[in-house]
Amino acid sequence: MAAVSLSVSTVKPLGDRVFVKVSASEEKTAGGLYLPDTAKEKPQVGEVVALGAGKRNDDGSRQELEVKVGDKVLYSKYAGTDVKLGTEEYVLLSEKDILAVVG
């Protein structure tokens, strides 16, 4: 079986799924102490980089997603599937797990 090379441009979410580039978590506290990886909170904010075609309705039509590529979003803490491409962190999640568009 041939190896598959993954990059952001080759990831196409299906249905109502959204591919989000995770914003970097805080490296140090307000007091200046550096946090080890085990003490960092899981990020909940990121930028939408790819969208699925939308959820299919009962009549066969597609329901357009509310978010767009480039939107900065806040999502549920433990939602989706974490994906690492190179050094970048991403999460693949359903649109229902997005809580808000921010900024």
From Swiss-Prot:
Q: Which organism is it from?
A: Nostoc sp. (strain PCC 7120 / SAG 25.82 / UTEX 2576)
* Entry similarity comment: Belongs to the GroES chaperonin family.
* Assembly and binders: Heptamer of 7 subunits arranged in a ring. Interacts with the chaperonin GroEL.
Q: Where is the signal peptide?
A: none
Localization of this protein: Cytoplasm
Q: Which GO terms describe its biological process?
A: chaperone cofactor-dependent protein refolding
Q: Which InterPro entries match?
A: Chaperonin_GroES (IPR020818), Chaperonin_GroES_sf (IPR037124), Chaprnonin_Cpn10_CS (IPR018369), GroES-like_sf (IPR011032)
| Protein name per Swiss-Prot or TrEMBL | Co-chaperonin GroES
An MF annotation (GO) of this entry: protein-folding chaperone binding
What Pfam families does this protein map onto? Cpn10
